[in-house]
Amino acid sequence: MARIAGVNIPNHQHTVIGLTAIFGIGTTRAHQICKTTGVAIDKKVKDLIDADLEKLRDEVGKFVTEGDLRREVTMSIKRLMDLGCYRGVRHRKDLPVRGQRTKTNARTRKGPRKSGVQLKK
């Protein structure tokens, strides 16, 4: 298995698909990386030579990926919550942030249904 940006890339996959295993690299960026490094898109990871892997490592290193990107996203959400803006409030309440309806849907974000309010006896 090839190791790029701290992630083990599966040997049986094509280079482009294998690069998408890295958090922060999707298919578009993976194609871009392969094009700039000159690595064949349809080549399997196990068939790459060390020089190709080194080129890929250098190119991937130019982007914010994995832990740094996760930290950046978390800090961005925390900043919204500290500001108290609408998006921050929605994050704090664990509700959909981008204007989706919540009266009937949004079960994934809200979690399982809570039982009705019980009256005191």
Swiss-Prot record:
Family: Belongs to the universal ribosomal protein uS13 family.
Function per UniProt: Located at the top of the head of the 30S subunit, it contacts several helices of the 16S rRNA. In the 70S ribosome it contacts the 23S rRNA (bridge B1a) and protein L5 of the 50S subunit (bridge B1b), connecting the 2 subunits; these bridges are implicated in subunit movement. Contacts the tRNAs in the A and P-sites.
UniProt region (Disordered), positions on chain: 94-121
Protein name: Small ribosomal subunit protein uS13
Signal peptide stretch: none
Complex formation: Part of the 30S ribosomal subunit. Forms a loose heterodimer with protein S19. Forms two bridges to the 50S subunit in the 70S ribosome.
MF-aspect GO terms: rRNA binding; structural constituent of ribosome; tRNA binding
InterPro entries recorded: Rbsml_uS13_C, Ribosomal_uS13, Ribosomal_uS13-like_H2TH, Ribosomal_uS13_bac-type, Ribosomal_uS13_CS
Gene Ontology CC terms: cytosol; small ribosomal subunit
Keywords from the named record: Ribonucleoprotein, Ribosomal protein, RNA-binding, rRNA-binding, tRNA-binding
GO annotation terms (biological process): translation
HAMAP family per UniProt: Ribosomal_uS13
Pfam families (alphabetical): Ribosomal_S13
Compositional bias segments (type: Basic residues): 100-121
Protein source organism: Polynucleobacter necessarius subsp. necessarius (strain STIR1)
Keyword Repressor applies: no
